[in-house]
Design a protein with these regions (language model features):
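Polar, low-complexity export/assembly segments characteristic of proteins
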Residues: 25-131
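Short, flexible, surface-exposed loop segments at domain boundaries
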Residues: 4, 19-29
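Bacterial N-terminal signal peptides that target proteins for export
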Residues: 1-10
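Bacterial N-terminal signal peptides
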Residues: 9-18
């Protein structure tokens, strides 16, 4: 397994997996652009683990640390910063939208899947949808 770690203000760690595929009955959904809608404030410290998988590519796992008391706008900024730190800026663009939303778009290359693998942050709800 090959690992690459990136830390941004002590909040973000990214891990690139050298292998891994989805099960046949658990096929990911691909798009060129995704929206992550953040609702509610954090009621605990914790982490959010996202997986970005280019079609027929290597999955990239992005772990974002969230501090207790962070509001939805700041959580969106933490997620945006996590994507920026972990993903190649020549391939992906990320930004916040409406304060509490994060957009992740491809600049070039194949469409990609985006999923929240797990979250240990209490109270925060995320809605991930294709744009």
């Amino acid at each position: 397994m090959k690992f690459r770690s990136t830390t941004l203000y002590g909040f973000v760690t990214a891990v690139v997996l050298a292998s891994g595929t989805a099960a046949a009955d658990d096929q990911p959904s691909y798009s060129n652009k995704w929206r992550v809608e953040v609702s509610e404030s954090a009621k605990s410290d914790g982490t959010m683990l996202f997986r970005v998988t280019p079609k027929e590519g290597t999955p990239i796992e992005v772990t974002v640390s969230i501090k207790d008391g962070r509001g939805e706008n700041n959580i969106a900024k933490d997620i945006r910063d996590g994507f920026k730190a972990a993903l190649d800026p020549k391939i992906f663009h990320t930004e916040t939208d409406d304060g509490e939303d994060v957009l992740l778009k491809k600049k070039k290359g194949p469409d990609f899947a985006l999923v929240l693998v797990e979250s240990t942050v209490e109270s925060v709800r995320l809605n991930i949808e294709k744009e």
